[in-house]
Amino acid sequence: MPLCCLRVSCRTVRFRSKQLMLASQYVWAKEVPNPLEVNSGITYSCQIGDHADRSLRAALQLFAQIAQEPVFDQLRTKEQLGYIAQGYATASVGLMSYRFLVQSERDPVYVETRIEAVLDYLKTFIEELKDEEFEKHRQALIAKKEEKPKNLGEEGRRFWGAIGDRFYEFGKRKFCACSLTSSSYLDYHWK
């Protein structure tokens, strides 16, 4: 093998993820290179399960749809923790997570306590969610997943996204919509 090929293969970054043990907590703290920088950032990740579980993945996306407004409202609007304050569903090799991302001038330890308070609030929020509100969120997500690409560029981005994430699941939007429509799915994941 030519030397140039060896150099390229040595520099290739491999995607990896680590399935954490149940109820485990890990913190990776890194010092900011500039001591005058007042901003900090926190990524708080809650591992949900295996990315291959399509029904659970659809449930996670529905959770993310429902949680989007309350998370933003609490962290960004009410507590004003920072300009970037969001929660979203994400997948990586072998697992999927619900992740909070907050950039703030506040101490990351304090921000973490506020994220945990939002998680407690979300539990109550979802338990008290009226059937009509739940149905609006479910229908909105189904419509989003069934939406046809508006142009060739958008369709291409969807295909390249399936290639780029290395799952090669070109029909995952359709499967998510079908899963959300199924009543047995709703009975299993939400009752």
Predicted ranges, named:
Residues 1-191:
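Mature, solvent-exposed C-terminal subdomains and processed small-chain segments of exported/organellar
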